[in-house]
Amino acid sequence: MVGKAEDLDLCFGKMMVFGGDGVGGGMMRGVGVITEWKDIPMELLLRIVSLVDDRTAIVASGVCSGWRDAICLGLTHLSLSWSKNNMNNLVLSLAPKFTKLQVLILRQDKQQLEDSAVETIAKCCHDLQDLDLSKSFKLSDRSLYALARGCPNLIKLNISGCSAFSDAALGYLSGFCRKLKILNLCGCVKAASDRALKAIGYNCGQLQSLNLGWCENVGDVGVMSLAYGCPDLRALDLCGCVLITDESVIALANNCLHLRSLGLYYCQNITDRAIYSLAHRRLNNKNMWKSVKNRHEEEGLINLNISQCTALTPPAVQALCDSFPALHTCPGRHSLIISGCLNLTSVHCACAFQAHRTASAFPHPAH
């Protein structure tokens, strides 16, 4: 720590010298010359703060009132995930100061965060767009109600593992946070119900990514509501949603034309009918995809997890592979996951056929 302080003093001395006449006289005669740390321009201070870790930025905000005001007004991204024991008190102390925050990461390894902290965030940080509350096991519906009232500009929300939230509170939140594009509900067994998904489908039409992993109460009614209400959906994780059937996948295939990633791990009610509906949407939407072929973003499925979907047959999955060349079964590029489906080992992606054609083009040497 002493070494760091000496380095800072050395740098400060150089700034004072170069700010004046080259021999140190700038401290007395230069106009606007840096003579103390508090004289550093706000733009330079924020640039320096952007290069250090969040803990250092917080310490810097306590150096003097000038630094405090500059950092509190200029800091837009903050992570407190490094705090192992005192996160709740930190939030209660910092949220009223850092009112311009747009991104706040409060991911935890053990229970720390309480409703009082989230309520303070909602009261003070109205510009918040990205909030990570994952593994906040102590939080109750009070937190979601507070966010609904205070943070209407949320675009990305991660509440994975927050098992105490109810579907009523989640539905209420969706009615106020209508700009949501990325929502992680993995493990939110009570909150992620068909009733909540109907509310999300009705209110959050801009939604692009939704993680419903291991939300075992989710059924076809909820997923179909999402498919109809969120046509721009790009990524949907339904892994462990054991109640869904082909009807959910068919609704997604017909309505979510930009869907690129779909997780169906352990959805054992899924049959070939669902897979063929995905494969055929490539043909049905061929003209639409031609119109966007110049976009940087690739259209069509590029990731699919059908592990443990034991009712599927090779012809259906092969048809899907043929329709979407970006789905790979080859080593190192696995984007079609079929673990636990021993009857699908014959399915191969386009790379395998290309390699076979290349090998066939060269005659075997004579023995």
Feature names for model-found ranges:
Residues C64, S79-D127:
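F-box-proximal linker/hinge
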Residues A57-L73:
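Short helix-loop-helix/strand-helix junction enriched in hydrophobic and basic residues
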Residues S65, L73, T99, K123-H126, ...:
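Inter-repeat linker/turn residues at the boundaries of leucine-rich repeats
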Residues M1-D39, A366-H367:
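CRL adaptor-proximal regions
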Residues I40-V52, G66-W67:
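Short hydrophobic alpha-helical "box" of cullin-RING ligase substrate receptors
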Residues L92-P96, V118-C124, L144-G150, L170-F176, ...:
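A structural signal for leucine-rich repeat
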Residues L78-L80, L104-R107, Q129-L133, L157-I159, ...:
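Conserved hydrophobic beta-strand positions in leucine-rich repeat
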Residues K84-L90, K110-S116, F137-R142, S163-A168, ...:
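Short, solvent-exposed loop/turn at the beta-strand->alpha-helix junction
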